[in-house]
Amino acid sequence: MQISYFHVPAEMPQDLRPDAAVVIDVLRATTTIARALHNGAEAVQAFASLEDLRAAAAEWPADARLLLGERGGQMLEGFDLGNSPVAVTPEQVAGKRLFMSTTNGTRALDRVREVPLLLTAALPNREAVAQRVLAKQPSHVAIVGSGWEGAYSLEDSLAAGALGHRLLELDPTGSSAANDELTAAVSLWRQWQSDPEACLRTATHGQRLIRLGDHDADFRCCAGLDQLGVVPTQVEPGVLRAA
């Protein structure tokens, strides 16, 4: 199994056809998706476009839906929730369809929505995702970071390295790094693995969240390694369910 990592969706070659893709947006979309599905959400439906989100949500019963969204780290006006993983409690989300749009993560999902096996990962479900990928045995898996507005993000590379490290560890003879970006991400993980929260806080997006207000609970949640067994899996374009 070849494992590639792309810092942002635009770096993934248009002609690349991986068997599997794993999208990462540690701060905070893929952490929130994992937490929401773990807490009983019926599904998370991701949108790059707010217009498309509102149109799709309007067709869903009001008592069975929630609108989640942020731009620049701040909750969107008229939405039920922002992009905080600690806000998607069982009381809030159980049984509901979550219509979600964020600055970076949902756009990354849109880029790889045609890949046969599409998963999302964060630090809390790293082990579960690694085990699922290995069970499927794709010949090539692309780990895709969301970045920040098209640029590199430290925290996504940390999580990509955590996932890549675990895949290589679990399958040392059958898996290999397909690009230097993955090798560098694994090295980054080895540097910060004893204190991933410190890395998240050091990252420019972490600093951005700190400036916006008290996000200590979000940082703790996003940095918690291997705490969730849920694997968000695309079941139809843009729709993720627990698996």
Swiss-Prot record:
It comes from the Bacteria. Gene3D superfamilies: ComB-like. The keyword Hydrolase applies. InterPro entries: ComB-like, ComB-like_sf. Its EC number is 3.1.3.71. Keywords: Hydrolase, Magnesium. Its cofactor is Mg(2+). It is an enzyme of class 3 (hydrolase). GO terms for molecular function: 2-phosphosulfolactate phosphatase activity; magnesium ion binding; sulfopyruvate decarboxylase activity. It catalyses: (2R)-O-phospho-3-sulfolactate + H2O = (2R)-3-sulfolactate + phosphate. Belongs to the ComB family. PANTHER family: 2-PHOSPHOSULFOLACTATE PHOSPHATASE-RELATED. This is Probable 2-phosphosulfolactate phosphatase.
